[in-house]
Amino acid sequence: MPKSRISLVHQSSNPFSRNAALALAEVSFLNEVITTIAYNPEGAIAHTLHYLPKKMRDRLTQELGRRTWMPPERASIRSHPGREIARLALTKSGLNRRLGLAYLGSIDWVCTSLDCHVAKYHLQGLDAIYAYEDGAATSFQAAKQQGILCLYDLPILFYRLSREIQAEEAQRFPELAPALQAAQEPAWKLERKEQEIHLADHIFVPSSFIKRSLIDAEVKPDKVSVIPYGAPVDYFYPQSKPDQPFRAIFEIGRAHV
C-alpha cells in the first residue's frame, strides 16, 4: 500500500514545525517541507560567509542560524527566501518605518505570499497539506478543490480568546497596549484565521486550553486533537546576549486547564 504524501508548510524554522516534519518523515509520510529560508550550516552560503569581515560574518551567522532547517531523511526542502530576506533587510535597517512601508516589513507580507505560492505550485500529487496559522487560507482553498486533506497545526490560542484576553489587559495596563498585537490585528487577517479553521479537516493543538478556544469558535471537538509539547529541561541552555535590553515574553497559549 503506497504511503501518504504530505507536504508541511511553515514560514520559518522553529522547534514545533521542525519536529512535526521529523515525525512525518519517520513514518515516511513527508513529501517536502516548504518554507522561506532554510539555512544549512554546512552549505555553500555558510562557507561563503567565511570571506566576510568578522563582525558582519558573526551577525549574519547568528541571524541565519535561527533559520537552520535540515531536510529530514527521504524528504526535500523547498525554500522561497525572497520576501523574508527583503523583510529582514527592511526591519533591521529601519527603512520600513522611515519610508512608511510597515506592511512590507511585517511577517504577514511573507506568510500570505508563501501561502499563495504553495496554492499555485506545490499541491500537485499530494494526499495532504500540513500548515500553520496565518499561512494556510489560500492553499487550503486550492487543496479542497483538488480533494487534498487539509491538516492544521495551531500552537497558540485561537485569536478570538487571545484578542479578548489582550483587550482586557490593554484596559488594565494602557502603557502595554501597543505591545498587545492580537488586539490590533486587521479584519482581513482575522478573516483568514476564520477560513483556516473551517477549511481544515483536522486541527492539532498542544493543550486542552487551546482546544477550548477552538470549540468556543464553533469547531467540532472531534475535529481537534491535543498533542502536548514537552522536552527534557536538561537540554535547554540559554544563549549569551550580545546587548543589554530587557526582553519580556507574553505567553497565554499553552497552559493546560
Each model region followed by its residue ranges:
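A conserved catalytic-core segment of Leloir-type glycosyltransferases
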Residues: P2, T35-W109
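Acceptor-binding helix/loop patch of EC 2.4 sugar-transfer enzymes
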Residues: A46-Y51, H80-S106, Q146-E191
